[in-house]
Every structure is written in C-alpha cells, then in structure tokens.
C-alpha cells in the first residue's frame, strides 16, 4: 500500500493523535517533530528515522527503518546506540542519514532532536548564592 493511501487513512483517526490549542500533534514512534503531517509521519514511509534517549541515560539511540524487510516488522528496524561526545554524536547521525539515503529534510530534525536529548542529559550546575558578610559594630 502506498504511503499516500496510508496517510489518507491515518491522518484523522490514529491512536497517536493529540489535538490541543487548535493544533494536531502525534506521539507515534519515529516522528521527529511530533507533528501530524505526511512528511514527519513515522508509520507510513518505507524509510524512517527516529532518535530516542538511551536506556542508561547516556547517549542516544538512532532507530532506522530499513527498506528491505517491510513484510517482517520485527526485523525492519535497526537500533544503533551512540555514546560519544556531542559533536561526534551529531556528526555520526548526519552521516548515517546521508549515507543510507534517507530523506534529506529529516537530517536537520534528527540532529535537533539528538541535540535536545544530549542537552537534557547534561548535569545541571547548581549556583550557590553568595552570602553577604554581616556587619559587626
């Protein structure tokens, strides 16, 4: 079944839809922008990309849907864990999307999602309040 036909079926009646503030969002896996649109839908296309936080809380997991094995859903997804520094992680995601010939418009969305995940995993530095010395008379 073509992606356009699947989109016509799924676009208004999906269990992943969230309608808030006159906008429609989607919580489906491999939807990089969480937007209910044909371009970012993670269910209907033959090749999709998803970025998730790693289970141990360090690094990201890149989930790629392969073109081969469409009839075998259990083996159609490849999960790659990347646990490097931020620059190396983002460049490896960029290379994975480019070399495997995924949609070029998904590249920037995947990089932004991975960057936000890596930023959330950084430890937060607690700023100490400076105390003023008390006046002694």
From Swiss-Prot:
Molecular-function GO terms, alphabetical: structural constituent of ribosome
Phosphoserine sites (modified residues): 115
Record's keyword annotation contains Acetylation: yes
Keyword line: Acetylation, Cytoplasm, Isopeptide bond, Phosphoprotein, Ribonucleoprotein, Ribosomal protein, Ubl conjugation
Entry keyword annotation includes Magnesium: no
Main location: cytoplasm
Residues joined by cross-link Glycyl lysine isopeptide (Lys-Gly) (interchain with G-Cter in SUMO2): 58, 65
Pfam families per UniProt: Ribosomal_L28e
A GO biological process held by the record: translation
Membership in a protein family: Belongs to the eukaryotic ribosomal protein eL28 family.
Function (record text): Component of the large ribosomal subunit. The ribosome is a large ribonucleoprotein complex responsible for the synthesis of proteins in the cell.
Assembly mode: Component of the large ribosomal subunit.
PANTHER family: 60S RIBOSOMAL PROTEIN L28
Name of the protein in question: Large ribosomal subunit protein eL28
Organism in which the protein naturally occurs: Oryctolagus cuniculus
Lineage per the UniProt record: Eukaryota, Metazoa, Chordata, Craniata, Vertebrata
Gene: RPL28
